[in-house]
Amino acid sequence: MMTTSVLRMIRSGGGWQLLDDGRPVFWFPERNKGLEIARLMADARSLNHGTRTMLEVQNDDDAMETIAAFA
């Protein structure tokens, strides 16, 4: 069975918090910069370790939305 990792961007403190499997790892003042780093992390994790990684972002309705998957 393949392990799946989840990176999540949530609103926090006037910016965006990046969570790695529920653990806070970075805070960004801008959503786009956070997404840029999160995509890079997810892609690297998939390429280097073969770990399936999902990237989820909190939308305007406060629901989590999957915006990318790296396998």
Functional labels for PLM-detected ranges:
Residues L47-A71:
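Short, mixed-charge low-complexity intrinsically disordered segments
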Residues D21-K33:
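A short, exposed loop/beta-hairpin motif centered on an aromatic-Gly-Thr core
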Residues T3, E30-D43:
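Charged, amphipathic alpha-helical segments
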Residues R8, R45-L47:
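Generic marker of residues within folded, mature protein domains
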